[in-house]
Amino acid sequence: MDNNNAFQLSFDEQHYAWLAIDVPGEKMNTLQAAFAEEMQAVFATLNEKRGQIKGLIIHSLKPDNFIAGADVRMLEACQSVHEAQALASQGQQMFQQLADLPFPVVAAIHGPCLGGGLELALACDYRVCTEDEVTRLGLPEVMLGLLPGSGGTQRLPRLIGLLPALDLILTGKQLRAKKAKKLGVVDACVPHSVLLDVAKRLLEEKGHKKRAQVTLPIKEKLLANTDLGRKLIFDQAAKKTQQKTRGNYPAAQAILEVIQYGLEKGMHAGLEYEAKRFAELVMTRESKALRSIFFATTEMKKDLGADAKPAPVAAVGVLGGGLMGAGISHVTVAKAKTSVRIKDVANDGVLNALNYNYKLFDKQRQRKILTKAQLQAQMSQLSGGTGFVGFDRCDVVIEAVFEDLKLKQQMVADIEANAKPTTIFATNTSSLPIHQIASQAQRPQNIVGLHYFSPVEKMPLVEVIPHATTSDETIATVVTLARKQGKTPIVVKDCAGFYVNRILAPYMNEAAQVLMAGEPIEKLDAALLDFGFPVGPITLLDEVGVDIGAKIMPILVKELGPRFQGPDVFDVLLKDNRKGRKSGKGFYTYKGSKKKEVDKSVYKLLKLTPESKLNDKEIAMRCLLPMLNEAVRCLDEGIIRSARDGDMGAIFGIGFPPFLGGPFRYMDTLGLTKVVEMMNQHTEKYGERFAPCDGLLTRAGLGEKFYP
């Protein structure tokens, strides 16, 4: 067969067929519509030799991936539901031909087996995967606002049962090998070195027979195979899905309907309905926005932030053993696979960071992600003390001490005195300008901002902030390190609040204005949850800490002007020791594991009588418009380099609703004329803080958009 083909068919002396997948010129195997002709030739050969073939083994020639999924770029070419449906039907037909082969087929999986890759594997009789860390199996289409469109919604429930299949498809979660084996997604997980041998042996052990129908557990039969049981499962799933998505993600409801339809009407009807609903989702605004995030994150993986080669990083130092320092040390060891030396003024601080790491690793051990030996190996990469021992080996030192300019300047001096001349000093400040921190440095070219978000091990964004004389190599090195830590880095200009806090502040200020106008706290939070944010603004303030807000806001007012001046609530709250969750009370009460409730006494403290006057949409738009306005200012001032970076920063930094694609894509969707119109209406009603900025007015006047 042509070596330029993605699918290469061969036969061994024992009459086994081997189908190797290797997409030419690509690092990852993806499925493309253009391969249909190749696959038809493969099926023709297999059917022609059907009487001689004992079985077929499908495997990848890529060193670290099976099939990462269908090529999402194909969907961008679809101009109609009809075209998208034809694409899904083509994939279904190809996998059905695989399932209909007269001899058994086994998929030998190493590395990611996702989306269309897993759907291909599900069409096989058997599946064997490696137990390597790189091996992951899942159907993540829901993350793109889609459903599995090549048979996944029909085959997975029939293989592993309805309940576990719903969990996998609705969440898009990826399974490690052992979990996949436990659920029955794969028949065996083995060392990589014997993968192909075991796959072939499995066919021999099965007597070269097609797989019989899977026998599901009694509980699954009672629940999923009876009308009453199915109704109960789907009703509960719909209720939970609505609570989680608040109706903002149509793919979740479509997944439930397609799976239910297939179980009730049969496989053939289920596949037809799957293709239809898949196609409808492809054309939705939500899926287009979610796909734009996928493309942006893929592009950003190639972006080093500067035109320079990153320096190698073999060891990292962390200054400060508090929550941020502990989190930074964790992602450096766990994700970046780099050793860390922690320094704190007190031994207790170092012990706190080590204990924090141990607890996170031990959770992984309890979930059988790590063995005890692997946990110990991870912890051996962490060390610390109250002095600078070991800092002479650090290539990067990340500072996570208190937000105090003189203290941070002292940290710069200490590292310049105790580390290599080439050591990069990265400051995790959330509000102080980087050029001020670097103002007394001997080597200012090595200093850069690296703003993480809390909790570090969960929040995906990091802002990289060079000052005027930061070297390109420094930028490229910390961008690369951040990416290895599992983060999405965006390079932003050195200015008060940087990007994320600068667009968050007007949003939070307006939420406070709405609150001080008498809107009930729970109504205000619920309105933004319904709009699509992961938490409401008042809950967010409680989680971040009222004291943190009280520190950041005056800096923004001083540096950027009176539009950042919010209602004076911080002092009143702090005098009553209301810092939020950390002090046990804020706007909500926090008592043990009991569900948080609004602390009604806060109304009296703020001299308010709660009364709902606005509807949810009015509340949401009041809070959102100042954020949109500030995002445009940031773009025009060069704080962010592109609308893409602004959208990614908002989504990954503050949880801007992903299904809207970010503030800039959302404004494009609304139309800039409409955005300006809404801002003018709010200006008349609430004041000059809503006045649209020049950049918005100009673009709206010219009929421009942020994206082509």
UniProtKB/Swiss-Prot annotation:
<comment type="similarity">
    <text>In the N-terminal section; belongs to the enoyl-CoA hydratase/isomerase family.</text>
</comment>
<comment type="function">
    <text>Catalyzes the formation of a hydroxyacyl-CoA by addition of water on enoyl-CoA. Also exhibits 3-hydroxyacyl-CoA epimerase and 3-hydroxyacyl-CoA dehydrogenase activities.</text>
</comment>
<dbReference type="InterPro" id="IPR050136">
    <property type="entry name" value="FA_oxidation_alpha_subunit"/>
</dbReference>
<dbReference type="GO" id="GO:0070403">
    <property type="term" value="F:NAD+ binding"/>
</dbReference>
<keyword id="KW-0511">Multifunctional enzyme</keyword>
<dbReference type="GO" id="GO:0004300">
    <property type="term" value="F:enoyl-CoA hydratase activity"/>
</dbReference>
<dbReference type="InterPro" id="IPR006180">
    <property type="entry name" value="3-OHacyl-CoA_DH_CS"/>
</dbReference>
<dbReference type="Pfam" id="PF02737">
    <property type="entry name" value="3HCDH_N"/>
</dbReference>
<keyword id="KW-0456">Lyase</keyword>
<feature type="region of interest" description="3-hydroxyacyl-CoA dehydrogenase">
    <location>
        <begin position="311"/>
        <end position="708"/>
    </location>
</feature>
<dbReference type="InterPro" id="IPR012802">
    <property type="entry name" value="FadJ"/>
</dbReference>
<keyword id="KW-0560">Oxidoreductase</keyword>
<dbReference type="GO" id="GO:0005737">
    <property type="term" value="C:cytoplasm"/>
</dbReference>
<dbReference type="InterPro" id="IPR006108">
    <property type="entry name" value="3HC_DH_C"/>
</dbReference>
<dbReference type="InterPro" id="IPR018376">
    <property type="entry name" value="Enoyl-CoA_hyd/isom_CS"/>
</dbReference>
<dbReference type="InterPro" id="IPR029045">
    <property type="entry name" value="ClpP/crotonase-like_dom_sf"/>
</dbReference>
<keyword id="KW-0520">NAD</keyword>
<feature type="site" description="Important for catalytic activity">
    <location>
        <position position="141"/>
    </location>
</feature>
<dbReference type="InterPro" id="IPR001753">
    <property type="entry name" value="Enoyl-CoA_hydra/iso"/>
</dbReference>
<keyword id="KW-0442">Lipid degradation</keyword>
<protein>
    <recommendedName>
        <fullName>Fatty acid oxidation complex subunit alpha</fullName>
        <ecNumber>4.2.1.17</ecNumber>
        <ecNumber>5.1.2.3</ecNumber>
        <ecNumber>1.1.1.35</ecNumber>
    </recommendedName>
</protein>
<keyword id="KW-0276">Fatty acid metabolism</keyword>
<dbReference type="InterPro" id="IPR008927">
    <property type="entry name" value="6-PGluconate_DH-like_C_sf"/>
</dbReference>
<dbReference type="GO" id="GO:0016509">
    <property type="term" value="F:long-chain-3-hydroxyacyl-CoA dehydrogenase activity"/>
</dbReference>
<dbReference type="InterPro" id="IPR006176">
    <property type="entry name" value="3-OHacyl-CoA_DH_NAD-bd"/>
</dbReference>
<keyword id="KW-0413">Isomerase</keyword>
<dbReference type="GO" id="GO:0008692">
    <property type="term" value="F:3-hydroxybutyryl-CoA epimerase activity"/>
</dbReference>
<dbReference type="GO" id="GO:0006635">
    <property type="term" value="P:fatty acid beta-oxidation"/>
</dbReference>
<comment type="pathway">
    <text>Lipid metabolism; fatty acid beta-oxidation.</text>
</comment>
<feature type="site" description="Important for catalytic activity">
    <location>
        <position position="119"/>
    </location>
</feature>
<keyword id="KW-0443">Lipid metabolism</keyword>
<comment type="similarity">
    <text>In the central section; belongs to the 3-hydroxyacyl-CoA dehydrogenase family.</text>
</comment>
<comment type="subunit">
    <text>Heterotetramer of two alpha chains (FadJ) and two beta chains (FadI).</text>
</comment>
<feature type="region of interest" description="Enoyl-CoA hydratase">
    <location>
        <begin position="1"/>
        <end position="191"/>
    </location>
</feature>
<keyword id="KW-0963">Cytoplasm</keyword>
<dbReference type="Pfam" id="PF00378">
    <property type="entry name" value="ECH_1"/>
</dbReference>
<dbReference type="Pfam" id="PF00725">
    <property type="entry name" value="3HCDH"/>
</dbReference>
<dbReference type="InterPro" id="IPR036291">
    <property type="entry name" value="NAD(P)-bd_dom_sf"/>
</dbReference>
